[in-house]
Curated annotation (Swiss-Prot):
NCBIfam families registered for this protein in UniProt: PRK11836.1, PRK14848.1
Stated name of the protein: Deubiquitinase SseL
Primary localisation category: secreted
EC numbers: 3.4.22.-
Family, as annotated: Belongs to the peptidase C79 family.
GO cellular component: extracellular region; host cell cytoplasm
Catalytic site: 222, 284 (nucleophile)
Species name: Salmonella arizonae (strain ATCC BAA-731 / CDC346-86 / RSK2980)
Function comment: Effector proteins function to alter host cell physiology and promote bacterial survival in host tissues. This protease targets the host cell ubiquitin pathway by acting as a deubiquitinase in infected host cells.
Lineage: Bacteria, Pseudomonadati, Pseudomonadota, Gammaproteobacteria, Enterobacterales
């Protein structure tokens, strides 16, 4: 028994047995996690089983696995594939005739990280849709152009929806000095009203803009990042667009809205327009999320300089690195839509 446990999991028999107790020792868990990070498949399988627990330890372990899966935490090459295969095996067990009513598998029947990772591994498209529906529920488009619905949630070219962007950006910026508004369409599809102008009118009239006011704006099936910020008490507006240049009508609508916020002089509205999406199809929402993450981390630095430098550096990445960004950022965004 000692030799078997040690060779499979690099744990002593007491450490292994302790994993199934109510109070798991930090030492045994740390040893197991280290082997998981190194890509040991037996340890990954064991940690995925621990993640099924519906207690603090189960949630902690599930988060560690997802951080490795999404690239937030570094592990061995292909660790994401090893983790999602382990989750898929659990999902298949949870849905067989014997186990399907077993409450121990609850996390594989709700919008959990474990279920999302299992869905990414299944080759069965109908199963992917079934799992996607459990995770997404029923979604409603906020604009006529917005693409939503229960399709392949793991498609590398899927458009991120308003609700998904909202949950991700609100979750990421909690406690930070950024005011992030619910994503909007620039122009109302039936009335033709400039929605950004309307929201700015309301904000200015009520409490005024914060020092860093963020809008994620949909312009005909495309997300752009909009930031109103202050430099020496002057309001500036920054538009970060990671695909083809916006048409002049769209730019005029944005400039008209910016005047309401106080960005009324020549040069107060700055457009950064660089196509970053060659290897990140329909990735405009991903870059909005990334822009917010960067500006949250850089604090008082010039946002124009930060996003220009980021864009230039991104274009220097290899195709493989850009493709990895696409995969990992989608996973990080979707994590905010999961309940455990």
């Amino acid at each position: 028994m000692n030799i078997c446990v040690n060779s499979l999991y690099r744990l002593s028999t007491p450490q292994f047995q302790n994993l199934y107790s109510e109070e798991v020792s930090d030492e045994g868990l740390a040893l197991l996690i280290r082997e998981v990070e190194n890509g040991d498949q037996n340890c990954i399988d064991l940690l995925c089983n621990l993640a099924l627990r519906n207690d603090d330890l189960g949630h902690k372990v599930e988060k560690i696995l997802f951080d490795l899966f999404s690239g937030k935490k570094h592990g061995s090459p292909d660790i994401d594939k090893k983790i999602n295969q382990a989750c898929l095996m659990l999902y298949q067990t949870a849905n067989n005739d014997i186990a399907k009513n077993n409450t121990d598998f609850k996390k594989l029947h709700i919008p959990s990280r474990l279920l999302y990772m299992a869905g990414s591994a299944t080759p069965d498209f109908s199963k992917k849709l079934e799992i996607a529906h459990k995770i997404l529920g029923d979604q409603i488009a906020q604009t006529e152009e917005e693409q939503v619905g229960v399709e392949n949630l793991w498609c590398p070219a899927r458009m991120v929806s308003s609700d998904e962007l909202s949950r991700a950006t609100q979750g990421m910026t909690q406690g930070l000095s950024l005011s992030v508004n619910y994503p909007i369409g620039l122009i109302h599809p039936t009335t033709g009203e400039n929605v950004l102008s309307a929201q700015l009118h309301e904000k200015v009239a009520q409490s005024g803009l914060s020092d860093n006011e963020v809008f994620l704006i949909n312009t005909e099936s495309h997300w752009i990042f909009c930031l109103f910020y202050k430099i020496a008490e002057k309001i500036k507006c920054l538009i970060f667009n990671t695909h083809h240049d916006l048409n002049q009508n769209t730019k005029q609508e944005i400039r008209a809205a910016a005047k309401i916020a106080g960005a009324s002089e020549e040069g107060d509205v700055n457009f950064i327009e660089i196509d970053l999406q060659n290897n990140v199809p329909n990735g405009c929402g991903l870059f909005c999320f990334q822009a917010l993450q960067l500006l949250s981390a850089t604090g008082q630095n010039d946002p124009v300089a930060v996003l220009r430098e980021y864009s230039e550096n991104f274009l220097r990445l290899s195709v493989e690195e850009q493709t990895l960004f696409n995969t990992e950022t989608r996973r990080k965004i979707h994590e905010y839509s999961l309940t455990s």
